Amino acid sequence: MFFAARVAAPFVFELFCRQDWRAWTRPELLFIDRDLVCLFLRHRHIMRSAHANDARARRDRKDSKDRKGLVFVPSVPFVLSVLSVLSVLSLLLLSSTIMKYSSIKRFLLLATIVLIVTPALPAWAGGNDKLANIPRSEYSARRQKLLAQIKDGIVVMVGAREEDFGEVGRFRQRNDFMYLTGVQTPAAYLIFVPAGVIPGKPQHETVFIPPRNPGHEQWTGFQIGPGAEGEQFFGLQEVAPSTAFKERLSELLARPAAEGKPPTKIYTVMPSWKGGEISRESRFVEMLQQSHPKNPIVDVSGIIAPLRLIKSQSEIEMLQKAVDVSIEGHREIMAAIKPGAYEYEAQAALEAPWTRLGSERPGYPSIVGSGINGTILHYNENRKRIEAGELVVVDAAAEYSYYTADITRTYPASGKFTPRQREVYQLVLEAQRAAEKAFVPGKSSLLDLQRAAKKVMENSPLRDKKGNTLDKSFIHGLGHWIGMDVHDVGSYMSLPVGSVFTIEPGIYLPDEGFGVRIEDDYLVTDKGLVKMSAKMPSEAAEIERMMLSQRPAPPQR
């Protein structure tokens, strides 16, 4: 009845409040509450999936002595069926009301549209044919490229859990898992079997996700379940319950041994060292080693990294969106950086537009370092008071649909650079431009660009307090890849077409109490570099103009 009331509301308003008796002829009213239509269609889809899961459960019970865990399974489709009947009755009531003021032709047209649109539920439920703004077909193509390079093993991976982000942290899927599947469900696994690796087994892709749990969803939100529901939503061959993962893996690995063939290799993501933290990958690899000691374990990261390095058009669009959103934050922070303000206040002004523009989170901890803190490369405490005459290094960018930008600017707290600050800033900017000009499509590496930037600093007459050329104060690499990670994966031997990287020269002078860094994002094309962050000013004069223009004018005497 709630559904019927919500759908009927616009028509009732037109009919009785505006006395528009031809309201039914206005098609825009059909779309006044599209989200509600999506909810209704999703409800019908869930009902079908519940019936399918119920049928599977009944089959399983025939071979099970303990039926306690299945007592409530039949009640799910029953409840959903009752809800469906109520929905149909509500629609019939609505239809009879509409028929009083409309023709049979228009009513039949509406009924036909509903019948045609309803089977297309998975696309409507997900909003479109994409997962996290990447087409489902692209995820499939990525899997095909991966499996085409593996001839002697199967791919086995584990996804992230909710517990990995603390008790109430926001879930984020692991990058490689997300890259291959688009599945954002916590506690997932995958098994990809290339053709010919397992005797009698064609190429097959299975993702394992937890069965739906209404009680859990009450706390964390709607989750897609295994079976037909998940297969349609994610565009995968098979989506099975996570409880079946270990048994399925053992079954697959046992087949070659039963036929006297060498043990199948297990390709998985090997654990990375993170400050001594025991990651889920570590425990997962340990489990594989203990459960299948005869099967060699191979790191699949070396195969996935080159795939992730070359960005598709969809990925480039997400990176550009992340860049554009990040720039809005940098524009906002210029008004917040002033003597007497705190670094965290400036950070708040920086990050607020990101959320407003659809960013899920910062791409990395925001660096807002004033004065001496600007000489600390990964400073992120952001607690110091900003003093007059200081420079503030802001290295911060947003993530958008799993892709992150990386932008750095250096701002004068008083609105204008001192002569010394300005000459150092200009040298850093010249070094960045020299690196840009040094790029030759198909030939240059990041090291070539770094040499060009350092040469500018080395040839400059500027010196530090000890008399050294300022290239000695450029203490880090010139740049890095960006993508799903701020320091994304891939070899730096070349700069291939389709890759995206940063150019970020910097000079750090602790003895003088300031540092300068300028960082922008670049897309490699066959014609040269495209500066994705070109909308963000970097000229000293333009930075000063923008900062001063956002400050209140002094009172007139």
Language-model features and meaning:
Residues M1-T112, V117-P119:
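Intrinsic disorder/low-complexity segments
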Residues R56, K65-R67, M99-L108, A123-R557:
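Active-site neighborhoods and metal-handling regions in enzymes and metal-associated proteins
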